[in-house]
Amino acid sequence: MANERRTLLLEFEKPLVELEAQIQQVRDKSSEFGVDVSEQIRELEERAKQLRYEIFSKLTPGQTLQVARHPRRPSTLDYIQAISEEWIELHGDRRGSDDPAIVGGIGRLNDQPVVMLGQQKGRDTKDNVARNFGMASPGGYRKALRLMEHANRFQMPILTFIDTPAAWAGVDAEKFGQGEAIAYNLREMFRFEVPIICTVIGEGGSGGALAIGVGDRLLMFEHAVYSVAPPEACAAILWRDAQKAPQAAEALKITARDLLKLGIIDEIVPEPVGAAHSNPVEAAENLKAALLRNLAEVQALSSSERRELRYQKFRRMGVFTEAV
């Protein structure tokens, strides 16, 4: 467990981990010598709590990207299983493909039938390879579309969970129509009559994120990221140097706070102090509360109102004025 903790340790977390180790040493000494050090432990724990808050409330965009990519960050399946009372996974795009990078199915949210889907990363190297690191193929996006069409046909709200560095950019992806699959999803999501709530739970990268990201509301976890391209790709394109990813992350405005100011997202879902991977249960509770609140608001509108507002929401993005 100690080795795993060191492996997953982010550089900026080191002072916190050292303090936690100090607390454990004091506890061990107390047990060994039978000394009451409860007051000292309380003070150290208070310091650790304050330090954790200070670290995670002042993350740079580059550090936020590291948190969004944390191997122990809750995934789409983690959240679906945590927030739904019942869950049945559905498979396949009905064209011969069942991409494991996209998962989805029917569940109940507060006893309301909903269709939930999203990108799924792996927990270890083997699982990540099997799921292609959450980078979906054209078949994956067609599977997502099939599930969303099912939801629209049977009048069930759609909840999508975005967590991908980008769509798969391999030769086979182009051969099987990656661009067409993404574009088709965008068009159809604007047409659906049912409520659509999209949430960026980790990485929201490029067209791979947007392909399941057209909705009435776009929510985003506090330490998630959302951008037109991964910062490494942006740095390689602009400066021919992927090592300049931190500068690219600053320029891209990838954080939830920046995107809320720009009007790209509608709400920031708060994370536990220490990020979602430190307390997945609390993170899931925050997500469920946000989904239920936004779903109730969107369901109060007629289907024609939803479609018009959804369309106008995305038409407003990127609009700017120039001074003469």
Curated annotation (Swiss-Prot):
InterPro entries: Acetyl_CoA_COase_a_su, ClpP/crotonase-like_dom_sf, COA_CT_C. It comes from Thermosynechococcus vestitus (strain NIES-2133 / IAM M-273 / BP-1). SUPFAM superfamilies: ClpP/crotonase. HAMAP family: AcetylCoA_CT_alpha. Pathway: Lipid metabolism; malonyl-CoA biosynthesis; malonyl-CoA from acetyl-CoA: step 1/1. Residues 44-297 form the CoA carboxyltransferase C-terminal domain. Belongs to the AccA family. Keywords: ATP-binding, Cytoplasm, Fatty acid biosynthesis, Fatty acid metabolism, Lipid biosynthesis, Lipid metabolism, Nucleotide-binding, Transferase. One of its GO terms (cellular component) is acetyl-CoA carboxylase complex. It catalyses: N(6)-carboxybiotinyl-L-lysyl-[protein] + acetyl-CoA = N(6)-biotinyl-L-lysyl-[protein] + malonyl-CoA. Its EC number is 2.1.3.15. It comes from the Bacteria. Component of the acetyl coenzyme A carboxylase (ACC) complex. First, biotin carboxylase catalyzes the carboxylation of biotin on its carrier protein (BCCP) and then the CO(2) group is transferred by the carboxyltransferase to acetyl-CoA to form malonyl-CoA. This is Acetyl-coenzyme A carboxylase carboxyl transferase subunit alpha. GO terms for molecular function: acetyl-CoA carboxylase activity; ATP binding; carboxyl- or carbamoyltransferase activity. It is found in: Cytoplasm. One of its GO terms (biological process) is malonyl-CoA biosynthetic process. Acetyl-CoA carboxylase is a heterohexamer composed of biotin carboxyl carrier protein (AccB), biotin carboxylase (AccC) and two subunits each of ACCase subunit alpha (AccA) and ACCase subunit beta (AccD). It is an enzyme of class 2 (transferase). The gene is accA. The keyword Cytoplasm applies.
